Regions:
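Conserved class I S-adenosyl-L-methionine
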Residues: 1-6
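Conserved SAM-binding loop of SAM-dependent methyltransferases across substrates and taxa
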Residues: 7-19
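Hydrophobic adenine-recognition pocket in adenosine-nucleotide-binding enzymes
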Residues: 77
Length: 177
């Protein structure tokens, strides 16, 4: 399940994989859902879209359609959430869905000096509520993993600047058995 699926980039890539039986994308923006539908249809054709369900709504509230997924993805999403929404996302993803694996990516705030982000309050996008440093993201990820029974590893994504690190960072959460 792709929480905050946007225009369906990840879902379109995954939809072509014949070993994946079921995909769900969730986004609150109807234009994003429409874009995802088109992108996935272009990638796999009309028959391939049968295994993809797109939901217009919030992933901060429990929905039965979220259940039964092996993986939760939140790709460049958490930074768009206010603290109460972030807590709600964590509850839905890790307590309600409880997947075998979750993947969360977010910008590395330290890297912003490389991109000169002064016009957006030092952030990459005007809608970002926050951006975490590498240490902040690692601490948040470890806290979530410990609280919900997941082993966590955090890895860089993108070219690594010698001082500021990577542009983005990934936390992979594997549920303890």
């Amino acid at each position: 399940i792709d929480f905050g699926c946007g225009h369906g980039w990840l879902l379109a890539e995954l939809a072509v994989d014949t070993e994946i039986e079921r995909l769900t994308g969730v986004d609150f923006d109807d234009k994003c859902i429409a874009g995802a539908r088109r992108r996935i249809g272009s990638a796999v054709g009309p028959r391939g879209t049968d295994k993809v369900k797109l939901l217009e709504g919030l992933f901060t509230h429990r929905d039965q359609d979220f259940l039964g997924h092996d993986v939760v993805a939140a790709i460049e999403v958490v930074e768009h959430l206010e603290p109460p929404q972030l807590d709600a996302f964590v509850g839905v993803a890790f307590d309600y869905v409880r997947p075998a694996r979750a993947v969360v990516t977010t910008p590395n705030a330290e890297y912003n000096v490389v991109w000169h982000t002064r016009r957006t309050r030092g952030r990459r996008h005007p809608d970002h509520r926050f951006e975490w440093s590498r240490n902040e993201f690692a601490e948040w990820s470890q806290k979530i993993g410990t609280a919900h029974g997941y082993a966590v590893y955090v890895v860089p994504l993108g070219s690594i600047h010698p001082v500021w690190g990577p542009p983005t960072q990934i936390a992979v959460f594997d549920r303890a058995r």
